[in-house]
């Protein structure tokens, strides 16, 4: 094991190199990071495991990185020991905000490209972000050990993109470790050292934070100027709070306590604060004894793209859901939430997410880490609605949609960049046209791959657009998108009525052309999920007061003639009339309870394949209650 000589707090800036690894999802960032940890010797061989820096169970199971991880790595080059600050970043489009925060803590970026796949949409997106942050770019082809790798072809693609020679593109294998030592040498040569002022008052940028059940908030910082000591009071310049640090240290690869952190170093600080409002990502940390006067430029707050309601199945868990979201917010700065009430689902929160994967991950973490059983409403985007009387409404939830005549509805748009093999151009064009996309430009990035630019309503992308894109291109296409203003659209609110009563959880804002198909789909789904009652239940879809689709759940019928053996027909008729009158009265007074399982199944965006299983569960639950 290599002994690390550069001690935190006393490391000269000239030997520090802070860099991050950026790439499209599944191009091998975490595997290359594993080899770097192995080569540097900071992780003993017996403790090494795949995806070492992916600490969450979800990350290990799904094979994706969700949280950026910062690690201090020693590396000797030409007899001098250097200190590398490495940040492994996520690759999925939903976690672009994580990547942008990591870039602000670095001077260089390793742009990793899969030698079997070539440049993909998120490769370009991350590259442009790194260029915006003025970082030194080191292009690298990974997975060169695979038989299907085409390093020469893809090296030319990369060279054409960033303006270097194909021979400048490094070739590595995260699996075998080939070329990784050369990559570390290249990082030392190409990435500039930090240029903070070690003698100035301490200034550190908070670029992340996590919640520890025992020690409270763990704040990750990048020191820009000066020095912070473990016995020195610290001051948060943005929120104006002062703390006594319990511990200061670096991550190498586990938390390692140190006496101090100096300019250019990346580390952590624990103040013992348990209140989530006491640590804000993007804030500047300084010494309370010798404070800085000017804070560092922070981050632009992320803007949620998708909204959905989260409701506890057991309403008594509402306070626990609030605490869980507060703690998760520390670890996930892009999550926003406000309390909301639903007639059907009770108390819950309206949550804003960066995309569907982000929404899925938050839901899963709430379930695993905090033991909560939740119902999630269908995802939707925000709309700006102008009513006939001129009143303005910002709608994040279909229940906020104003009644009466609507003058104008404005919906958010995205600029979508799709990279696909040329044989699928027609299929991609059809898909985008079906989703109200407007084509921009199209350019060939190599002889057989095309980058297509579309302007598409965000609402069309947040449901199943990506799945359909993968399906129509046999998995070869990749998608990246970002905000691109707004435009007016012909949208309507579709309400679902059960027994004549609106169920707010099933309401949706859809394009007028798709309103009928949504109404038919939901009424059919609910007909198969809601148990039969003693009276007939109508399920209707409506736009305002106009019914556009209807399904009926037929009544259960008791055989009232079973005890009549022959005899007078008038006796039988009397019993049937009595039953008919009873059912009529029951229909007027009867209240339909929609089971929780039916809500969960109806609000899932998948097909109806599991409806029969859900129905069986509902019946079993009812028998148990009976």
Curated annotation (Swiss-Prot):
One of its GO terms (molecular function) is translation elongation factor activity. Residues 603-626 are annotated as: Disordered. It is found in: Cell membrane. It catalyses: GTP + H2O = GDP + phosphate + H(+). Its main location: membrane. Pfam families: EFG_C, GTP_EFTU, GTP_EFTU_D2, LepA_C. SMART domains: EFG_C. The keyword Membrane applies. The keyword Iron-sulfur does not apply. Residues 609-626 have a biased composition (Basic and acidic residues). Required for accurate and efficient protein synthesis under certain stress conditions. May act as a fidelity factor of the translation reaction, by catalyzing a one-codon backward translocation of tRNAs on improperly translocated ribosomes. Back-translocation proceeds from a post-translocation (POST) complex to a pre-translocation (PRE) complex, thus giving elongation factor G a second chance to translocate the tRNAs correctly. Binds to ribosomes in a GTP-dependent manner. This is Elongation factor 4. It comes from Bifidobacterium longum subsp. infantis (strain ATCC 15697 / DSM 20088 / JCM 1222 / NCTC 11817 / S12). The lineage of its organism: Bacteria, Bacillati, Actinomycetota, Actinomycetes, Bifidobacteriales.
């Amino acid at each position: 094991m290599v002994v690390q000589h550069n001690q935190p707090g006393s490391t000269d800036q000239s030997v520090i190199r802070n860099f991050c690894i950026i790439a499209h999802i599944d191009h091998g960032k975490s595997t290359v990071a594993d080899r770097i940890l192995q080569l540097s010797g900071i992780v003993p061989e017996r403790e090494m495991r795949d995806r070492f820096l992916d600490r969450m169970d979800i990350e290990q199971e799904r094979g994706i990185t969700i949280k950026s991880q910062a690690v201090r790595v020693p590396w000797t080059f030409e007899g001098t020991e250097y200190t590398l600050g490495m940040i492994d970043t996520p690759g999925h489009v939903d976690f672009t905000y994580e990547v942008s925060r990591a870039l602000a803590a670095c001077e260089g970026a390793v742009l990793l490209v899969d030698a079997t796949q070539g440049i993909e949409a998120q490769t370009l997106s991350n590259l442009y972000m790194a260029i915006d942050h003025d970082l030194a770019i080191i292009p690298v082809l990974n997975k060169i050990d695979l038989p299907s790798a085409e390093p020469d072809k893809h090296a030319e693609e990369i060279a054409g993109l960033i303006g270097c020679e194909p021979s400048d593109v490094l070739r590595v294998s995260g699996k075998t470790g080939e070329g990784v030592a050369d990559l570390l040498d290249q990082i030392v040569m190409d990435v500039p050292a930090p240029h903070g002022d070690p003698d100035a008052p301490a200034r550190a940028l908070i670029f992340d934070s996590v919640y520890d059940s025992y020690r409270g908030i763990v704040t990750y910082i990048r020191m820009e100027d000066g020095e912070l000591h473990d016995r020195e009071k610290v001051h948060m310049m943005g929120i104006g709070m002062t703390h006594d640090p319990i511990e200061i240290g670096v991550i190498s690869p586990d938390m390692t306590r140190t006496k101090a952190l100096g300019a250019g170093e990346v580390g952590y600080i624990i103040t013992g604060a348990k209140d989530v409002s006491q640590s804000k990502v993007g804030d500047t940390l300084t010494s309370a004894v010798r404070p800085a006067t000017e804070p560092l430029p922070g981050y632009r707050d992320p803007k949620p793209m998708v909204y959905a309601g989260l409701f506890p199945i057991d309403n008594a868990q509402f306070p626990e859901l609030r605490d869980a979201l507060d703690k998760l917010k520390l670890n996930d700065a892009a999550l926003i939430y406000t309390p909301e009430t639903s007639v059907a689902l009770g108390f819950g929160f309206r949550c804003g997410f960066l995309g569907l994967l982000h929404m899925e991950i938050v839901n899963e973490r709430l379930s695993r880490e905090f033991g909560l059983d939740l119902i999630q409403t269908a995802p939707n985007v925000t709309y700006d609605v102008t009513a006939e009387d001129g009143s303005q409404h910002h709608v994040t939830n279909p229940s906020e949609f104003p009644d009466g005549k609507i003058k104008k509805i404005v919906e958010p748009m995205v600029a979508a960049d799709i990279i696909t093999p040329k044989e699928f151009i027609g299929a991609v064009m059809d898909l985008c046209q079906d989703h109200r996309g407007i084509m921009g430009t199209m350019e060939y990035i190599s002889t057989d791959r095309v980058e297509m630019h579309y302007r598409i309503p965000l609402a069309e992308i947040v449901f199943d657009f990506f799945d359909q894109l993968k399906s129509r291109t046999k998995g070869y296409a990749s998608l990246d998108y970002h905000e691109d203003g707004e435009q007016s659209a012909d949208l309507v609110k579709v309400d679902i009525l059960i027994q004549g009563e609106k169920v707010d959880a099933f309401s949706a804002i859809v394009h007028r052309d798709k309103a009928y198909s949504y109404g038919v789909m939901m009424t059919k789904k609910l007909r198969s999920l809601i148990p039969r009652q003693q009276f007939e239940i109508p399920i209707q879809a409506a736009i305002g007061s106009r019914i556009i689709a209807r399904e009926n759940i037929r009544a259960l019928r008791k055989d009232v003639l079973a005890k009549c053996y022959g005899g007078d027909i008038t006796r039988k008729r009397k019993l049937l009339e009595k039953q008919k009158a009873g059912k009529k009265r029951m229909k007027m007074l009867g209240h339909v309870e929609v089971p929780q399982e039916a809500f969960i199944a109806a609000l899932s965006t998948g097909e109806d394949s599991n409806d029969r299983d859900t129905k069986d569960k509902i019946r079993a639950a009812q028998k148990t209650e009976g």
